[in-house]
Amino acid sequence: MTKRAAAHGRTLKFGYRCHVIVRETEDEARAYASRLLSKLDAETGDAIRAKSLDSQSVGVQRQAQLRESAGSEGFVEENLWTGIGRARSGCGAAIVGTPDQVLAKLKAYQAEGIEAFILSGYPHAAECDLFARHVLPKLEHGPLTL
């Protein structure tokens, strides 16, 4: 895509939207991820995703494919959990781990050309606080916006 855009005198920038679950240990982070969905049954999850306006988008369909190919705990790759996509449409992945693991994952995405991140978590304020205290101080970044 970058080469195609350059052929037309344009420059593309890439961003990534995901959730973050950061805890002191990886086991704690994974346990919290599991607890988020502990009361969700498959039928309810299917209904939530089906009624979303974006349920037929290519991105959402690709996330569903990744979720189906994930291991039994929902991890499609190291520290990338697709389980959150069982409960919602759209952003269906979460970086899950210790502060250093989350930081390493974000840096790996930056190395692949991702320049902007839209990060969230559940509950929003609590996860934002954990990320701000444990990951953000170690992450090189430009101006932050709300």
What are these regions (language model features)?
Residues 1-5, 125-130, 134:
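Active-site-adjacent beta->alpha loops and helix N-cap segments on the catalytic face
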Residues 22, 121-128:
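Acidic-and-aromatic substrate-binding clefts and catalytic sites of carbohydrate-active enzymes
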